Amino acid sequence: MARIAGVNIPTNKRIVIALTYIYGIGLSLANRICEGCNIDHNVRVVNLSDDEIIRIRNFIRENYIVEGDLRKEVSMNIKFLTDIGCYRGLRHRRGLPVRGQRTHTNAKTRKGRSKLPVAAKKK
């Protein structure tokens, strides 16, 4: 198994799909990485040489923020919003939708399950 950015990527998949297993790399970014490293998009990870894997690893390290660093940056951004007390930070703190979605009937996932008492069965 090839290890890129601290993630074991699957060997039987195409390189473009395998790169999407890394947090912060989607399909379009994976295509851009392959173009930047001069690697065919359809080649499987098994068929990559060690030199090509090292090229991909270095390209990602130099040009993109992925995995732990990206998670840390996102959490720091959310913490900043909550610290300055803006509306978005307030919504994050309360666990409600941040981007203006309605909450009267929807947003069950974000709000969580309600703690309603369940009626006992009649005997």
Curated annotation (Swiss-Prot):
NCBIfam families the record matches: uS13_bact
A molecular function GO annotation: tRNA binding
Pfam families linked: Ribosomal_S13
Region described as Disordered: spans on this chain: 97-123
Annotated protein name in UniProt: Small ribosomal subunit protein uS13
Coiled coil: none
PANTHER family assigned: 30S RIBOSOMAL PROTEIN S13/40S RIBOSOMAL PROTEIN S18, SMALL RIBOSOMAL SUBUNIT PROTEIN US13M
SUPFAM superfamilies reported in the protein's UniProt record: S13-like H2TH domain
Keywords: Ribonucleoprotein, Ribosomal protein, RNA-binding, rRNA-binding, tRNA-binding
Function: Located at the top of the head of the 30S subunit, it contacts several helices of the 16S rRNA. In the 70S ribosome it contacts the 23S rRNA (bridge B1a) and protein L5 of the 50S subunit (bridge B1b), connecting the 2 subunits; these bridges are implicated in subunit movement. Contacts the tRNAs in the A and P-sites.
UniProt keyword annotation of Iron-sulfur present: no
Family: Belongs to the universal ribosomal protein uS13 family.
Organism domain of life: Bacteria
Quaternary structure, from the entry: Part of the 30S ribosomal subunit. Forms a loose heterodimer with protein S19. Forms two bridges to the 50S subunit in the 70S ribosome.
Gene Ontology, cellular component aspect: cytosol; small ribosomal subunit
RNA-binding recorded as keyword: yes
InterPro entries per record: Rbsml_uS13_C, Ribosomal_uS13, Ribosomal_uS13-like_H2TH, Ribosomal_uS13_bac-type, Ribosomal_uS13_CS
Single GO BP term: translation
